Amino acid sequence: MSGEKTEQPTPKKIRDARKKGQVAKSKEVVSTALIVALSAMLMGLSDYYFEHFSKLMLIPAEQSYLPFSQALSYVVDNVLLEFFYLCFPLLTVAALMAIASHVVQYGFLISGEAIKPDIKKINPIEGAKRIFSIKSLVEFLKSILKVVLLSILIWIIIKGNLVTLLQLPTCGIECITPLLGQILRQLMVICTVGFVVISIADYAFEYYQYIKELKMSKDEIKREYKEMEGSPEIKSKRRQFHQEIQSRNMRENVKRSSVVVANPTHIAIGILYKRGETPLPLVTFKYTDAQVQTVRKIAEEEGVPILQRIPLARALYWDALVDHYIPAEQIEATAEVLRWLERQNIEKQHSEML
């Protein structure tokens, strides 16, 4: 049936949806980008964070000999400073990655439609529908699958290091830190891989749902096409496109002509004749009215002679065909034009020699 939404959305439908803030996006992509970036940062700057975290822990003990009021002021100032050193790089990277992950998914987008107040959003009935909708159920199932997958991955890491963990009490303080660091790195790597897989699958699902929601019926596509056909903007662009093509073709036609026969502002006929190459003169173009002025301008730019012959121009316009030899009835008049052209070429050669 023509009313069923079985057709892929048109580019216009996608553009209109984008203006309203409707784009294919996955929250998991953002989460994964943040986790990967912050994990890599913590691993790469582990010495930096260990140093500042150690300073943070030692600040109260370092000022224990001072009076309470002095020690309190010093501790508060330095604790805040160390918190800044610890948090600022993480927050900066998190903000940049959040922006980048959105841009990667759907480019730069600022939509006023998405932030407009909507009475449906505060309607309790509509709110209940959203809570118990299929989409909410799918989100709930995705969360469960994510927890299950990550739990399995963590269990694999712990099981693989179970013997090492059981030996920690007898290992001594010297080996606890490197062993725990090794296990922590394994957990970060395996969880990162898990999150990447989850985000790819989730984006594919969200894109599928996005296209499904935008699908159109055949009637909608026909209606959109009719609206676009009648749009002044589309008509203007189409007219401009045709004019550009016509202008390019006109210049090519004038360039390959030997002479232009005009009448003088209403008709322009192009004639091509090369002795030894064309057995008879050939009509290269026929233009009328407003196009004649453009032909004259192009001919002057390209150095193609223009000759005013009103009877011949009219006869060729009515009797001759483009890219065909001139009719027999106009041979004599055309020969006169070609003799004039030959005299012009001879005079031009003489003037160049002088």
Curated annotation (Swiss-Prot):
Q: Per the record's keyword annotation, is DNA damage included, yes or no?
A: no
**What is the membrane topology listed in the Swiss-Prot or TrEMBL record?**
Multi-pass membrane protein
Keywords from the named record: Cell membrane, Membrane, Plasmid, Protein transport, Transmembrane, Transmembrane helix, Transport, Virulence
GO terms for biological process? Answer: protein secretion
Question: Its GO CC terms?
Answer: plasma membrane
Q: Enumerate the residue ranges of region (Disordered).
A: 1-20
Membrane-spanning residues = 30-50, 79-99, 138-158, 163-183, 187-207
Q: Where in the cell is it found?
A: Cell membrane
Task: Please indicate if the UniProt record lists Protein transport as a keyword.
Answer: yes
Q: Which NCBIfam families match?
A: FlhB_rel_III
Q: Which family does it belong to?
A: Belongs to the type III secretion exporter family.
Q: What is the role of this chain? A: Component of the yop secretion machinery.
> What name appears for this protein in its UniProt entry?
Yop proteins translocation protein U
Q: What is the scientific name of the source organism?
A: Yersinia pestis
Which gene does this sequence derive from? Answer: yscU
